[in-house]
């Protein structure tokens, strides 16, 4: 079939695009090239971190951080099983608590809570120990709580308080140090699960009440 002519069809030019930076010719047709401003915006938005502060400032910041860590540890250790987050306000170097204030706070907390734990353990028997050991040895249970208070006194106080708290923690209960009766999954848990001599274990735990009374008298 003879084709006598060609019909030229002009292609419509694309609508103007905001941000186009150049228009060129390719094979007889107009083309537009869209330019992205993202790279320029990224460059414009970049900020440089300031240079490090002076050595003195960095030392102060580090000391403040250490103080927060110690306070946080104590608050978590003596939180009485609370699940609410503890918010510690910012401290200045002048506000950092002294070792004396730490020990005084720990003694005050022990004086307030140990009698409660002793009261809960005063009626302990074999059946209660076997049934409730996991509960007593976690959170704010009387075994965990009393052991935690003794650990705080041993770590942050000195003299007779430290010695008496250490003696209580190391007192054997059916051959297992009392400190291990405040945890789950260890030797004490295995002993309770065995069901052997639980009456003796309960009596020995109650017997520690006299030593804890002596501990309280030293505060």
Curated annotation (Swiss-Prot):
Residues 101-219 form the Bacterial Rho-GAP domain. GO terms for biological process: negative regulation of phagocytosis. One of its GO terms (molecular function) is GTPase activator activity. Disulfide bonds: none annotated. Residues 1-54 are annotated as: Disordered. Residues 1-11 have a biased composition (Polar residues). Keywords: Cell outer membrane, GTPase activation, Membrane, Plasmid, Virulence. It is found in: Cell outer membrane. CDD domains: ToxGAP. Induction: At 37 degrees Celsius in the absence of calcium. Residues 16-32 have a biased composition (Low complexity). The record marks 144 as: Arginine finger. One of its GO terms (cellular component) is cell outer membrane. Belongs to the YopE family. N-terminal is important for export, C-terminal is indispensable for virulence. This is Outer membrane virulence protein YopE. It comes from Yersinia enterocolitica.
């Amino acid at each position: 079939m003879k084709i006598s002519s060609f019909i030229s069809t002009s292609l419509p030019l694309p609508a103007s695009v905001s941000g186009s930076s150049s228009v060129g010719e390719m094979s007889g047709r107009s083309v537009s090239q869209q330019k992205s401003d993202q790279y320029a915006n990224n460059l414009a938005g970049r900020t440089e971190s300031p240079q490090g502060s002076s050595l003195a400032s960095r030392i102060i910041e580090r000391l403040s951080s250490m103080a927060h860590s110690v306070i946080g540890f104590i608050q978590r250790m003596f939180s009485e099983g609370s699940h609410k987050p503890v918010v510690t306000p910012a401290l200045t170097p002048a506000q950092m608590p002294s070792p004396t204030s730490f020990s005084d706070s720990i003694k005050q907390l022990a004086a307030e809570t140990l009698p409660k734990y002793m009261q809960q353990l005063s009626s302990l028997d074999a059946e209660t120990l076997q049934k409730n050991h996991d509960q007593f040895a976690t959170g704010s249970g009387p075994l965990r709580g009393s052991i935690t208070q003794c650990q705080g006194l041993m770590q942050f106080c000195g003299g007779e308080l430290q010695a008496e708290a250490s003696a209580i923690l190391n007192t054997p209960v059916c051959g297992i140090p009392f400190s291990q009766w405040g945890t789950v999954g260890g030797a004490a848990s295995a002993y309770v699960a065995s069901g052997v001599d639980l009456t003796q274990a309960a009596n020995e735990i109650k017997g520690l009440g006299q030593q804890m009374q002596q501990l309280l008298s030293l505060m």
